[in-house]
Amino acid sequence: MCRLLVDDGYIVTGTTRKPERVEALASLGVRPVVVDVFDSDLLRSAVVAAKPDVVVHQLTDLPPGLDPKLMPEARARNARLREIGTRNLVSAATAAHAKHFVAQSIAFAYAPGAMPYDEAAPLNVATADEAAALTARAVASLEQQVLDGPFIATVLRYGRLYGPGTGFETPQGGGPVHVDAAADAARRAIRLERPGVFNVAEEDGTVCGASARAALDWNPAFRIG
């Protein structure tokens, strides 16, 4: 996504928790900032200093390839990131008077029901599966916090990511999306300033991505290069 935005002429400030990732961000033409999203004061200062028109929330904390042995702890970390991290980032964006907020969500937290799932389908917050409920409740919290913010709010429910850097070279499970196409959806959301919630996934009968295709002129076949 950073590469697409820089190529489009945007001035991009990218955050990372780890100083060793600064060089990689800079190589993409991004202005790197080292900050922990859980440090609300430092985060607010960093975002205000960047003077953003748009804040893009792509924060996750998951192991490479979604290693099953590491996923129980990762789910808890990711849920905390979606809840508290989102709260801090929304607060920082508000303090910076950002015009638009784009947030990454997921298109695989729906409650079992008729498929393909569209954006009106309920999330799986009431399931007896503790792991699934933890994820769904955190997703619901993230989305509601963003939608309640004082800015144009766009929530992109990504399908199951595959492609370079994801740990999966081919689609895994229902409702996949290539990482390049996901990045392009974010770019289009930024450019078009479309508010709302959009499924961003390939059509395989699991998830309906018609809203993103119509509102964002998005094509799941998009690839960089």
Residue spans for each PLM region:
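N-terminal Rossmann NAD(P)H-binding glycine-rich loop of SDR-like oxidoreductase domains
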Residues: M1-I11
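Conserved beta-strand positions in the Rossmann-like core of class I SAM-dependent methyltransferases
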Residues: T13, V33, T154
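NAD(P)H-binding glycine-rich loop region in Rossmannoid oxidoreductase-like domains
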Residues: R17-A26, V30-I84
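Conserved C-terminal active-site "lid" loop/helix of NAD(P)H-dependent oxidoreductases
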Residues: V22, V197, E202-G225
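Residue-level signal for the nucleotide or nucleotide-sugar donor/cofactor binding architecture
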Residues: F38, L81-I84, A133, R137, ...
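Conserved Rossmann-fold NAD(P)-dependent oxidoreductase catalytic core, especially the SDR/UDP-sugar
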Residues: L66-E130
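Conserved beta-loop-beta element that borders a ligand/cofactor-binding pocket
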Residues: H100, Q104-F108, A128-E130, V139-P164
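Alpha-helical substrate-binding/gating segment
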Residues: L161-G165, Q172-F198, E202-E203
